[in-house]
Amino acid sequence: KVVETIGTLTVTAQSIDPDNPNYKGITVDAPTDVEYTGEDQTWLPTVTDGNGKALVKDTDYTVTYDNEDRTNVTGIITVTINGAGNYAGTITRTYQITPKPVTITTESKTRAFDGTALTAGGKVEGIVSGETYGFKTTGSQTYVGSSQNTYEMVWADSEVEGTSGTYTAKKTNYTVTESIGTLVVTAGTPENPLDPTLVVNKTHDKSQTYKAGDVITFTITAKNIYEEAKTITLEELEGVALDANVFENVAPGAEVTATATYTVTEQDIVNGTFTNNVTVTFSGVDDKFTGTDTVDELEDANPHMTITKTTVGAEEGHIYKLGEVINYKVTATNDGNLTLTNVKVEDALTGNVGENAFTIDTLAPDEAQTFDVRYVVTENDVLAGKVVNNATGTATDPTDPDEPKTPVTPGEKEDPIETPNPSLAVVKTSDKTG
């Protein structure tokens, strides 16, 4: 008797899991991390059997992902591959979308102080084409010093002044590298000095005409052009008085005011102008700035001397006789506006000429000096019927010391003389005793 034992042939699914006993060399490739591109970056595995034959997705295996968003940077994405049909087992793979590098650059700029804010532009490089964002530079430097050229970037996931949702570029999808510029405001250079009127200004009343001895009042304003508080010091020309010259702890952009006074000299009148310079310095720096104000409202130089001659000691209209003495006073008056020097007064009639002339070392404006002279009436005067006496003079011109040409008005005095009466009396006598 033959006894049959019928065996059972069992065909099992080949496992894709290398750790499974039914694994027969099936390979599943591995993904690599990818950089954000703005596009969907779903990774699809390649599965091959031991003979190198590619298995078919959704027939021989299925693929699932633990994250539905495979466009943006979200972290690790786990991919699960499950065998299907004649294949079994499970294997997982992971990858991630990495942030795209972005460079934000703000520009550097240098400029001399001009009282306005220094700004500069910037740019963003690396944002995926088509995505939008908000960008502006916010750096600003007004006063002498330096600062970073800062910026403001508005992303899709930012909330800045109600702009959330306006833009599409997400900050999490990018890694930002900054290149920040510097804004520098200088106080000028030796080659290109700063306009001093940006720092110091000086003014005076231009509505009047000044003469020697008048006091001119100047108003001085000085500004702190530096980005930190400074002590401001004013220095005036010799002869100019300041009511205050040191101002401490002056804030950036703040101004201080001082008053200066100056007494006009005759030399200023001769020059025709007076230029007043005030120097401004700031604590902690070597910079110096000079404010200039020129006064040209000065009266014209007018050197002049008038000589007068008067008769003294006799009544008006007195008629002089032969041999009588006429007494004169000769007066030299400076009726100009400049002091005269080396004054010489001459009276030819009395012989006060040349070495005998009257001299005055200095004669100030409105000053007068008088000399007494006398003259004896001669027969020629009687014949002429009058005595005419002229006095004149010279002085060094202050406007041109090398040329003694000061205008002089000479003095003249005419006095009447008795009418000539020539006569001869003959007396005849006789001797009656003879």
Predicted segments, located by residue:
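Exported/extracytosolic protein signature
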Residues: 192-434
